[in-house]
């Protein structure tokens, strides 16, 4: 994860040591950057002013870990609720082959059909979850949406909108 400063046209690394930063969200006060880590199935909370951190190292804490799916897009609402969308469901095949980097790498680069067979979300799998950033409590799980994965999430007022892979329409849920 890198930060670009347009004033002096510089690029600096904020966070390294992650296996796929698939989503970013910045807290309303601008102090905390949340980073979804696709490879480790977790969300990191990072001091937004920090530089050159390593995931799991000093001053970089895991905000959520052991998630039921592979986190993708992140979004924060005005109440400090973090919405985590799941790009894929937790895969027993990937879990079993966690230490086989080559196999995992090939699977994550496979075509859409193969990925759907390995990681696709079932109708009862969570496609997104809502977490209170103040205390880390789980607020809500969004399930029952048979889709290839949730690629985007956007809270707006009393609704949350979901961009579903393979869907031509936008899905929503009341909160």
Q: Where in this protein do the model-derived segments appear?
A:
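Conserved beta-strand positions in repeat-built beta-propeller and related beta-rich domains
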Residues: 27, 33-40, 84-88, 118-123, ...
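Beta-rich, blade/repeat-based domains predominating
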Residues: 1, 13-32, 65-79, 117, ...
């Amino acid at each position: 994860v890198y930060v670009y400063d347009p004033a002096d046209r510089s690029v600096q690394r904020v966070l390294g040591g992650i296996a796929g930063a698939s989503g970013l969200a910045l807290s309303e006060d601008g102090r905390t950057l949340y980073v979804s880590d696709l490879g480790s199935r977790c969300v990191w909370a990072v001091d937004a002013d920090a530089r050159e951190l390593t995931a799991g190292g000093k001053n970089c804490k895991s905000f959520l870990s052991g998630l039921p799916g592979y986190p993708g897009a992140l979004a924060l609402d005005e109440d400090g609720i973090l919405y985590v969308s799941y790009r894929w469901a937790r895969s027993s095949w990937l879990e079993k082959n966690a230490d086989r980097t080559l196999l995992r790498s090939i699977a994550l680069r496979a075509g859409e059909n193969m990925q759907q067979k390995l990681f696709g979300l079932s109708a009862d799998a969570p496609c997104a979850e809502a977490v209170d950033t103040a205390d880390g409590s789980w607020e809500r799980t969004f399930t029952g949406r048979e889709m290839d994965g949730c690629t985007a999430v956007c809270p707006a007022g009393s609704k949350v909108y979901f961009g579903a892979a393979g869907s031509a329409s936008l899905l929503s849920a009341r909160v």
